[in-house]
């Protein structure tokens, strides 16, 4: 009974209302017409890469800053993010963010205050994330993996403020890329020791102790 219910709930519906581009891409399909559509989708993906590369190619040295979209502008962490981005901007770095509200807005605001190029890589979401008002170069993406390529390819470092699943995704993908030598080692800074302390304890006391990662792997992270 449980398995039957799961099959019903998990059955993909490619044409259902509100399906995102990522959902449509990842759904398993069986009819040949839909499979043909998947083959043609590669051109849309390629187009996103081309647009991203063209827009980002002349921004110069940059730092990608991540953090929660839900952070309020009246919190100390928001103001610290503004200040961090401002100082990086004054040092000659463009600032790259996900282009949305919260910490992304704070970083783009700081970039503007520091006289730096402020880049927002926005993503299509079901709840329609809108770009913030502090962006010089705005690029819209349908696919997360294309967007994340821009964060890594054009950044000299990552600064990661407290955030949720999206922030964790960006953190652990960058750690994986560095660990597997898919990209050169670059500074990966976690801002806010109190917030990140529990995660770092778990990495050290569980993952290292059980041999899932090495103690040297933790040297990739600065707090």
Locations of regions flagged by a protein language model:
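Active-site/ligand-binding-proximal alpha/beta "capping" segment
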Residues: 142-194
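Glycine-rich beta-alpha loop segments
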Residues: 2-22, 27-121
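Short gly/pro/ser/thr-enriched loop/turn and capping motifs at secondary-structure boundaries
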Residues: 125-130, 167, 195-198
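C-terminal functional extensions of proteins
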Residues: 191-223
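Structural motif
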Residues: 61-64, 93-94, 116-120, 136-138, ...
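Short, solvent-exposed amphipathic alpha-helical segments in soluble enzyme
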Residues: 112, 173-178, 204-208
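Acidic/glycine-enriched connector segments
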Residues: 79, 102-161
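Solvent-exposed alpha-helices and their adjacent loops that cap or buttress functional pockets
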Residues: 56-58, 87-89, 111-112, 129-133, ...
